[in-house]
Amino acid sequence: IISEGNVEVNSVLIFPVDQEKPELARALEPTLGDIPKPVIISREEWGAEEPKNSYSYHPYFDRLTLHHAACCSADDLEEGKAQVYWIQDFHQNGRGWNDIGYHFLVDRAGNIYQGRPETVIGAHVGGANTGNIGVCLLGCYHPPEVSCFQTITPESRQSIVELFSWVSDTYGQSPTVLLGHRDYFGTTACPGDNIWIELPIFRAEISDFIQSYFEMPPISIFQSPYPNPFSSQITLSFD
């Protein structure tokens, strides 16, 4: 869990003096992708506090990042709600941030929680938050640390794959851009060795999940003059 970050300049937009610049202080509209949105526990459901200030919105999307909380393990929905609320409280009142730093959090039962709206800039990779959607696994996955020896559950894995597949499809990102927190500046062990070693597998599984929606076999339609070839009623069979 790191600092909200330093000032970062990712791009400069220049407009002619007689041209009105586009409004960047609003959410980019998601596209209508083919991948269904997974079930996500809303902020209202886990009792989120309001952000302290207005959000800043992503001007584009080009990064995906996986974290671990390095604490706050949760094995069911009620534990997950409590831990997500604790993390928000720590980020807002311990770190002094605007809101919880992550966009999504996933517990060990596979429940997915909404953090900040994914259309707004988070606070999860200092110096690389713009365009970056961050997901945090509740728990601790770095074995050298005391009480930090967890491995990912099948339920968490499935939710991570489905969540990043939906995010990739909806916001036009390739699964190949998925990184662990440590891959940016090397100043942290996050997401822990037990998760970081899984990243190539995650990228492949997310790609396969997305591809499966574009390779579904076509539906064949057969017209059958049943029961009477001279009847106006037609029976259609779908294979």
Describe each PLM feature range:
Residues 17-69, 107-119, 123-217:
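Basic/polar, cationic surfaces and motifs that engage anionic cell-wall
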Residues 1-6:
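Short beta-strand-plus-loop segments that form exposed binding edges in beta-rich domains
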Residues 214-239:
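Glycine-centered coil/turn sites that cap beta-strands in beta-rich domains
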Residues 99-101, 173-175, 233:
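Short secondary-structure junction motifs
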Residues 58-94:
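Active-site acidic/histidine clusters and adjacent loop/turn architecture
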